[in-house]
Amino acid sequence: MHNNKFKLDIPLLKKWKSLAGSMFITFHRAFDVLINPEESLEQLIELGFDCVLTSGQNENAIDGINNLKSWNEKFGLQINIMPGGGIGIDNCKIFKAAGLSSIHLSGSKIINPIKIPKEVNKELSFLNQPLKDSDTNILRQVVQSFKFS
């Protein structure tokens, strides 16, 4: 998605966009490490991307709200700026109030650990993190809150 200079890999993205044809295409959070985000947004628009998923180049979207709002004001009619990262029921209305029309979240909750079979490499780091599962109640609450705020 981006090269070792932390800029968009335009030839690769042109190829991907060509393969995607008329499908809706989102550029994911690799955007958050690009050096010049506004130039990158212009390039993604020119390439025909529909959406960029971003935390506003911060650890979580609430900390990036100023960037998200600014980009949405400048580019939001040409590409959907979709905040993602740390979004939940407690803060989803902030994004709506900032003029952002969509959000991305896992809507998950921590679940009980499961027994890992002996054939699985238990040293994989993600196996040492709490297990999460999407929670339809959380998702329903966020949708209702965001939709009707």
Question: Across the structure, where does each feature detected by a protein language model lie?
Answer:
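Histidine/lysine/aspartate-rich catalytic loop segments that bind and position anionic ligands
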Residues: 12, 16, 22-62
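A cross-domain feature marking catalytic cores of carbohydrate-active enzymes
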Residues: 1, 27-31, 56, 83-85, ...
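Glycine/small-residue-rich loop that forms an oxyanion/phosphate-binding "nest" at active or ligand-binding sites
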Residues: 1-14, 19
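Glycine-rich phosphate-binding active-site loops on the catalytic face of alpha/beta enzymes
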Residues: 1-5, 49-62, 100-120, 130
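Short helix-capping segments at alpha-helix termini
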Residues: 20-23, 74-78, 148-149
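Catalytic cores of alpha/beta
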Residues: 12, 32-47, 69-83, 87-105
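C-terminal helical cap(s) of enzyme catalytic domains, especially alpha/beta-barrels
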Residues: 65-74, 94-98, 112-149
